[in-house]
């Protein structure tokens, strides 16, 4: 497909986003509209927005490449995304969050915990962690989307990053939560349609059915590269050797880190407060589950089965054909699928990036504008909306600058860094706000501090992937990690920080609880 046709498709896509952003702007009349869609969003729109925000481009391209390299063990992440990220999140967290949010009349995650525990310090602390930590996460998505546009249209990276940022900024700043959720829903439909087509066409390309393809994938286990065998790789339909470096990376970082970390993502939690009733929230469970099964399950499956395609066409497995794991899925799509689908897949990647990024910008803007500035400088409702818009703009500028300032190896770890901190710092306090009446504000503050500092300490001094990239431990102690004894360097920080955070909130709350 030529560049002109691609350009027309992208222009039509951008015009659709512009219209939906304008629609959100027209329907936004107060701060509640801007922050939580007036609590009257359609449950289908909410569920699609939740799923589209959940699934970023890194989940499609990055984790799809991981599946191509290491196999279907990553499908456990798909299961946790569905079971924890939707079923548990909606039923056990979402219902109570919606009721509590309406009762306390709050519009953000920091406000939810701050007002529940009657502590301004809790609200400001959570907002500060979001505003300081999330730009690094956003920079990952921004850079990924800009690089993708650069490669497709052969334009300068600086130009593609600027265009990409301006488009998202326009509909987030103007349309607020309604603009974000309307565009998320469209992007979710595009992602779902692309993955559904990929799932059905994959077996036609391989000329096999489901059982035949999986048997064949099992049979080629001896072709695993030696460097991956040394890490514990046993084949594309088997889990890695228990206790091996690959096993720890898959189980602690990807399956547990991402699978559990999603429960305390502020940009996801706020979605529960956008619908009018618990009945509407329940309707979103099936839609969310079905969306994640297709979008995530299809790409992980396609990643693993791409090895059969490359063996058939090029006589080698995926990691021999494409050295860079992040480029395996785009290369496979271009080689195996029709040209028109390659163009749609490009929109799928852009949609995944933009839906995640728009929610991040909105959350950061709400944190700095409403939760921090609005707390110390109370304003009228109309003025507060404009302050939040300025907060969104400021957050976008900070994330934009980070794309240029930080080295690639640090930015590349941004997702795991932020999700790990969110899980360790926020999850115990969030759970206790919903389920444990003996939790006190002193216990929550202790948990927030312990979770945040524990995560940062583990990232800087214990977990090798981040500590090597940051270089602080090396500069201070002359080695990449403090504890070199295996398996400590490969255990995800969440397994250090989350238990300490839970312990802190339980112990301090019991010590300070008064009937």
Role assignments for model-derived ranges:
Residues 1-515:
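Membrane-embedded helix-loop-helix hairpins and adjacent transmembrane boundary segments
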């Amino acid at each position: 497909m030529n560049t002109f046709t691609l350009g027309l498709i992208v222009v039509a896509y951008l015009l659709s986003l512009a219209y939906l952003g304008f629609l959100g702007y027209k329907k936004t009349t107060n701060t509640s509209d801007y922050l939580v869609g007036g609590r009257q969003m359609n449950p289908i729109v909410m569920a699609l927005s939740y799923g589209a925000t959940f699934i970023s481009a890194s989940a499609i391209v990055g984790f799809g490449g991981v599946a191509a390299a290491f196999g279907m063990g990553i499908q456990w992440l798909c299961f946790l995304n569905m079971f924890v990220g939707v079923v548990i999140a909606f039923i056990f967290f979402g219902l109570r969050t919606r009721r509590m949010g309406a009762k306390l009349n709050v519009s953000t995650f920091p406000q939810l915990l701050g007002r529940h525990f009657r502590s301004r310090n809790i609200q400001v602390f959570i907002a500060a962690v979001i505003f300081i930590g999330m730009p690094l996460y956003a920079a990952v998505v921004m850079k990924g989307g800009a690089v993708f546009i650069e490669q497709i249209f052969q334009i300068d990276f600086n130009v593609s990053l600027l265009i990409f940022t301006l488009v998202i900024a326009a509909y987030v700043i103007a349309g607020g939560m309604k603009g974000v959720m309307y565009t998320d829903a469209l992007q979710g439909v595009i992602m779902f349609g692309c993955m559904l087509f990929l799932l059905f066409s994959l077996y036609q390309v391989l000329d096999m059915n489901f059982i035949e393809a999986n048997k064949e994938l099992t049979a080629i286990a001896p072709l695993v590269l030696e460097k991956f065998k040394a890490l514990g790789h046993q084949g594309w339909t088997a889990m890695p050797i228990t206790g091996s470096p690959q096993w720890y990376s898959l189980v602690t970082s990807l399956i547990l880190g991402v699978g559990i970390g999603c429960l305390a993502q502020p940009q996801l939690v706020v979605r529960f407060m956008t619908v009018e009733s618990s009945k509407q929230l329940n309707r979103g469970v099936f839609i969310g589950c079905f969306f994640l099964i297709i979008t995530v399950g299809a790409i992980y499956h396609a990643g693993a089965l791409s090895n059969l395609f490359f063996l058939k066409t090029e006589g080698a497995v995926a990691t021999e054909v494409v050295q860079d794991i992040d480029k395996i899925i785009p290369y496979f799509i271009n080689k195996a699928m029709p040209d028109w689908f390659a163009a749609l897949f490009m929109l799928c990647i852009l949609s995944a990036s933009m839906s995640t990024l728009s929610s991040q910008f909105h959350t950061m803007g709400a944190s700095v504008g409403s939760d921090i500035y609005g707390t110390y400088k109370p304003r009228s409702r109309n003025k507060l909306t404009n302050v939040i818009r300025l907060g969104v703009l400021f957050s976008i500028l900070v994330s934009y600058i980070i794309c240029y300032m930080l080295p690639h190896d640090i930015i590349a770890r941004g997702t795991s860094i932020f999700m790990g901190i969110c899980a360790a710092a926020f999850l115990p306090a969030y759970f206790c706000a919903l389920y444990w009446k003996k939790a006190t504000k002193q216990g929550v503050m202790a948990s927030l501090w312990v979770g945040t500092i524990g995560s940062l300490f583990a990232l800087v001094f214990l977990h090798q992937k981040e500590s090597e990239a940051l270089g602080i431990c090396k500069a201070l102690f002359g080695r990449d990690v403090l504890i070199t004894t295996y398996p400590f360097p490969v255990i995800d920080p969440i397994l250090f920080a989350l238990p300490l955070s839970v312990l802190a909130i339980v112990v301090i709350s019991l010590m300070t609880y008064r009937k």
